[in-house]
A protein has these predicted regions:
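Membrane-active, amphipathic/fusogenic segments and juxtamembrane/transmembrane anchors
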Residues: 2-156, 220-245, 291-293, 303, ...
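Membrane-inserting effector segments that mediate pore formation, membrane fusion
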Residues: 139-211
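Amphipathic, membrane-active segments
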Residues: 188-257
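A long, low-hydrophobicity, low-complexity, charged/polar interaction segment common
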Residues: 227-307
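Hydrophobic, Leu/Ile/Phe/Ala-enriched alpha-helical segments that form helix-helix packing faces
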Residues: 24-35, 130-138, 197-208, 254-265
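Short glycine-rich, low-complexity/disordered patches
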Residues: 36-44, 140-151, 202-217, 261-281
Length: 330
């Protein structure tokens, strides 16, 4: 199913952000000619599997003074199921575009990046105060982004560098693997894990004092690339739950689940696990492949399909996966 619409204009929006015509033209070029394509997502919620893909765009006049980015987006209708080791998975893919999703391509950052949405702070100054406080204590980069929504639930993103992911995997490995890699790598991995845990704990605890709306669940996203992207997401109102979800035993369980998924679906580009607070464990949600196929649990697909029906019927908050970035580094 193809939907046509306007993704952005050069008018000043509700967040007091004005996008230049040149930026719209670059976005159109990237959508048409780029190696990846933006996903169509619901309410900027990464835990809901992508329901479509933006595959064509152009810039045209919007009124006498402004311009608009017109897009064509496909809402996926090619859906099938497969049974692997007794588990049912839903397979969703495009009929018109086989590029990977833009959200599945992350930069090779030199430092760990902590990112958050400026709208989830009382003021721009408070956002800078929070992020600069972390940067003063830890050797990291910080980033602010802007989701085009009124006041979305708070979100904190931790993007690890590749070496950190490697060392973390070593730290979580079995005794036999540890003995093979040697003491130097093991010591480095242990120190890396300790430093990472200290940063995450501080960021989560400090964030609970700054983020708004209060008493709303915070989405904590931990992602990094090592051959493919690993994405772990905790959504909770309790900061201690997010910290507990990252202890060594639970992370080991998460990596074991990912290894099993990788054996079943070897062409993974990104794999996402969600922490189930009620059952105190990590659960597979969905994965994406090199050709833009989405494979998820039956539960995750049904949730996405139901929300898509509601939002498409009501012309709701259907978004591309590209957020406006307001600062690379403060």
């Amino acid at each position: 199913m193809i939907y046509k619409g306007i993704a952005a204009t050069t008018k000043v929006d509700a967040h007091n952000i004005r996008i230049a015509k040149e930026a719209l033209e670059q976005a159109a070029h990237d959508i048409n000619e780029g190696k990846c394509a933006p996903a169509v997502v619901i309410e900027h919620d990464l835990t809901i599997l992508p329901i479509g893909k933006v595959y064509k765009a152009f810039v045209d006049s919007f009124d006498e003074e402004d311009y608009a980015l017109h897009i064509e987006q496909e809402i996926f209708e090619n859906v099938s199921s497969t049974i692997v080791n007794g588990e049912k998975y839903m397979v969703v893919k495009s009929d018109v575009d086989d590029r990977p999703f833009a959200s599945d391509i992350i930069s090779n950052n030199e430092k760990l990046i902590v990112g958050t949405d400026s709208v989830n702070f009382e003021s721009d100054e408070k956002a800078k105060e929070y992020l600069n406080g972390l940067r003063a204590e830890f050797d990291i980069d910080v980033q602010r982004f802007c989701r085009k929504s009124v006041i979305p639930d708070p979100e904190l993103v931790f993007q690890l560098v590749e070496n950190s992911v490697k060392y973390l995997l070593i730290y979580l490995c079995s005794k036999q693997v540890v003995e093979r890699v040697g003491d130097v790598l093991v010591d480095t991995a242990v120190n890396e894990a300790k430093n990472l845990y200290a940063l995450v704990k501080k960021a989560i605890k400090a964030g609970s004092k700054y983020l708004i709306p209060e008493n709303r669940p915070v989405t904590y996203i931990f992602k990094g690339s090592f051959n493919y992207i690993i994405e772990l997401i905790v959504k909770t109102t309790n900061p201690d739950v997010a910290i507990s979800a990252l202890n060594k035993e639970k992370l080991k369980e998460a990596i074991d689940k990912i290894d099993n998924i990788k054996e079943q679906f070897p062409k993974i580009l990104r794999v996402q696990l969600i922490y189930n607070e009620n059952e105190d464990k990590w659960e597979f949600n969905y994965l994406t492949t090199e050709v833009g196929v989405v494979i998820g649990t039956e539960q995750s697909y049904k949730k996405a399909a139901k929300l898509a029906e509601i939002y498409l019927g009501n012309s709701g908050d259907i978004n591309t996966d590209a957020s406006t970035q307001t600062d690379d580094v403060l």
